[in-house]
A protein has these predicted regions:
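Active-site-proximal acidic segments at structured loop/helix or strand boundaries
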Residues: 117, 121-204
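RNase H-like polynucleotidyl transferase catalytic core
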Residues: 89, 93-110, 129-131
Length: 204
């Protein structure tokens, strides 16, 4: 689970202002079957939504997710002691997934997705660089078309596509999706006042 360093511009039709869409990438470990999703931020909410969209794309849930140490997933990761973002941990509990963040400065822990990100930059993002997008939905439509092509392309080493390898190697071991999709929650620490009221977002 990772984000691409390359982004795609989104143009506001009314103002002409340009924002940078963030490109989320997941790669399944055995098959290399890849999912790509664009969002406007790398916020916890957008990150979790992209993770869940990946589960629905795959049609199931893996045993383990290996995210990078971005704040949307990991609060701290020092000397083997990991503190996950509360919302991300809550999502993982909902789907019964273990989260094992990559160790800081150990790129081999997520080498599969790093290779996947580079391939996606080359096969998808570079092909979209001369397109103009006015919203992220338009961008995701085009990404999905190219993603199908990418996953169906033969992997020379195996003489099979990532889609074929997925059906053989990963799909049989995915856990079924929960009947109810996870609903994002924000977790906040609050102090109870002497009047027993709790203040949230500045409102008593």
């Amino acid at each position: 689970v990772d984000y691409s360093g390359l982004t795609i511009p989104i143009v506001n039709q009314r103002t002409g202002e340009i924002s940078k869409a963030q490109i989320f990438v997941t790669v399944l470990g055995a098959s290399g079957y890849t999912y790509v999703h664009a969002s406007m931020t790398q916020s916890t909410k957008d990150f979790i939504n992209s993770n869940i969209n990946a589960f629905y794309f795959y049609g199931g849930v893996p045993n383990i997710l290996v995210p990078d140490n971005l704040k949307a997933a990991v609060i701290s990761n020092k000397k083997g002691i990991v503190k996950l973002n509360d919302a991300y941990a809550d999502m993982a509990r909902h789907y019964g997934i273990a989260i094992e963040p990559a160790r800081p400065y150990k790129p081999q822990d997520k080498s599969k997705v790093e290779l996947g990100v580079k391939a996606i930059q080359r096969w998808i993002l570079m092909r979209l660089r001369h397109h103009t997008f006015f919203n992220v939905d338009q961008l995701n439509e085009e990404i999905n078309k190219l993603l199908d092509f990418y996953n169906l392309k033969k992997v020379r080493r195996f003489n099979k596509s990532r889609t074929e390898l997925f059906e053989l190697l990963d799909k049989p071991y995915l856990h079924p999706l929960r009947a109810n999709r996870y609903v994002y929650k924000e977790f906040k620490k609050a102090t109870v006042g002497i009047d027993y009221h709790v203040e949230l977002l500045g409102n008593g």
